[in-house]
Amino acid sequence: MSDATDPGWFPLALRLRGARVVVVGGGGIALNKVRLLLAHAARIDILAPRLEDTLAAWQAEGRITHIAGEATPDRVRALLPGSRLVYAATDDRAVNRAVAAQADALNIPVCAVDDPEPSSFITPAQIHRGPVRIAISTGGAAPVLARRLRERIEAVMPAGLDALARFLQAERAHVVAACPDIGRRRRVWEDFLDGPGGEAAQRGEHAAARQVLDHLLAGAQTGGEVWLVGAGPGDPDLLTLRALHLMQNADSVLYDQLLPPALMDRVRRDAERVFVGKQRDRHTMPQDDINAELIRRARAGERVLRLKGGDPFIFGRGGEEIEALMAAGIPFQVVPGITAASGCAAYAGIPLTHRDCAQSCLFVTGHARRDGTLDLPWDSMARPGQTIAIYMGVTALPDLCTMLVRHGLPPDWPAAVVERGTRPDQRVLTGTLADLPALARAHAVGSPALVLVGQVVRHRVVTPPPLSGT
């Protein structure tokens, strides 16, 4: 049969509690399979001349049974009857294939590890979250790819999935009794999972989750919620798992000017997008109107994502927004993000602290007041032994550098500007307080950009390019 017409492997779940499983082999290959089998409460007999250390410890604890000896045809033939599954897990392919042939002759499912051809079943890469089981298989064609896929899936699975699954399991009979109609029951579960009830269950707040579920069963509409989420400095790979989860579950998203398209692509595709355009003093939507819009949408039952660059509580006006939500009685969550100072500095190769020259780091905003002046703690800023990270400081960069020199820092004090930090088109300019404004102007540096001031700039590390062919 050609690869194009081969139907492949049929996935199914098998209950192994108390079932006898024979494993031939006592080394590292066998260990990986025995670990999985023990997690599913199988009764394991191992045929091998000797056991590696972990297997030997499990044998001493009575968790497995060891039949000492080589995998001769007679020994294998005597051991296999009555077993539910067989694993041929030695480091000798010929031995594994001989074991597989004997198991096949007895109609016992057998897996010759890393050798699909003689196997009647294979063991996929697995993810466990309580009652939830996810299996990923490439049909034995590419086990490393299956493991990589498992890692990616695990990365986006919410941490509370186990608690959610157990809650649903516990409430299933209650929902069936309260809602006999299958179609309506399915809609109740969908609304529960997509709303605050599912979120509460994931957090282990079962009383709150049960209250939401009972409201849905009674025909009530669930209330909305606002999520203030920090999206990090720009690279989508720097999103937290929690941020990504909420981005993919929001009904609507209010987002700012500086979020790159690659990051916005991670938002649920059918979510309504509302651009509020906050950038310095140019606002598509004033802050009071943003607050009102968040409240309006939440009261309409929406799960509203307020997506902000960096961290919502570091120069992001997140504090003002949650005060408005609290006053209106709107439930909310805050998800921190990697702030620009740490993200951009790391990608630029500039440490924020250094034992030799910077024992502290000061975050300030370069956003001028309405009259154009900078209201900053200049005496605290113009000190050696620290790093200054200046947010939104490009426009006021000449004044910032002038004032730092006026308050005591030397003109040749190191400084840098990181434009579009963490993104593919990131630029880093290094200089001094005396020449950085001219450098930034000559290179037409724009927002978003972060200014770093301090001796740490001289410790910048530039990552070398990868070697050819790697």
Swiss-Prot record:
Q: In which pathway does it act?
A: Cofactor biosynthesis; adenosylcobalamin biosynthesis; precorrin-2 from uroporphyrinogen III: step 1/1; Cofactor biosynthesis; adenosylcobalamin biosynthesis; sirohydrochlorin from precorrin-2: step 1/1; Porphyrin-containing compound metabolism; siroheme biosynthesis; precorrin-2 from uroporphyrinogen III: step 1/1; Porphyrin-containing compound metabolism; siroheme biosynthesis; siroheme from sirohydrochlorin: step 1/1
Q: Per UniProt, where does S-adenosyl-L-methionine bind?
A: P233, G309, G310, D311, I314, T339, A340, M392, G421
Binding residues for NAD(+): G28, I29, P49, R50
Q: Return the SUPFAM superfamilies for the record.
A: NAD(P)-binding Rossmann-fold domains (SSF51735), Siroheme synthase middle domains-like (SSF75615), Tetrapyrrole methylase (SSF53790)
Which Enzyme Commission number(s) are listed?
2.1.1.107, 1.3.1.76, 4.99.1.4
Q: Where is this region: Uroporphyrinogen-III C-methyltransferase?
A: 224-470
**UniProt-listed Gene3D superfamilies:** Cobalt-precorrin-4 Transmethylase, Domain 1 (3.40.1010.10), Methyltransferase, Cobalt-precorrin-4 Transmethylase, Domain 2 (3.30.950.10), NAD(P)-binding Rossmann-like Domain (3.40.50.720), Sirohaem synthase, dimerisation domain (1.10.8.210), Siroheme synthase, domain 2 (3.30.160.110)
The record's catalysed reaction(s) read: uroporphyrinogen III + 2 S-adenosyl-L-methionine = precorrin-2 + 2 S-adenosyl-L-homocysteine + H(+); precorrin-2 + NAD(+) = sirohydrochlorin + NADH + 2 H(+); siroheme + 2 H(+) = sirohydrochlorin + Fe(2+)
Database matches in Pfam families: CysG_dimeriser (PF10414), NAD_binding_7 (PF13241), Sirohm_synth_M (PF14824), TP_methylase (PF00590)
**Sorted alphabetically, which keywords does the UniProt record give?**
Cobalamin biosynthesis, Lyase, Methyltransferase, Multifunctional enzyme, NAD, Oxidoreductase, Porphyrin biosynthesis, S-adenosyl-L-methionine, Transferase
The domain of life is Bacteria
* Region feature Precorrin-2 dehydrogenase /sirohydrochlorin ferrochelatase, mapped onto this chain: 1-213
Which residues are catalytic?
D256 (proton acceptor), K278 (proton donor)
Q: Give a GO biological-process term.
A: siroheme biosynthetic process
Query: One GO molecular function term?
Result: uroporphyrin-III C-methyltransferase activity
HAMAP family from the xrefs?
Answer: Siroheme_synth (MF_01646)
Q: Which NCBIfam families match?
A: cobA_cysG_Cterm, cysG_Nterm, PRK06136.1, PRK10637.1
Described by its record, this protein's role is as follows: Then it catalyzes the NAD-dependent ring dehydrogenation of precorrin-2 to yield sirohydrochlorin. Finally, it catalyzes the ferrochelation of sirohydrochlorin to yield siroheme.
Q: Which family does it belong to?
A: In the N-terminal section; belongs to the precorrin-2 dehydrogenase / sirohydrochlorin ferrochelatase family.
Q: What is this protein called?
A: Siroheme synthase
Annotated organism of origin: Gluconacetobacter diazotrophicus (strain ATCC 49037 / DSM 5601 / CCUG 37298 / CIP 103539 / LMG 7603 / PAl5)
What is the gene called? cysG
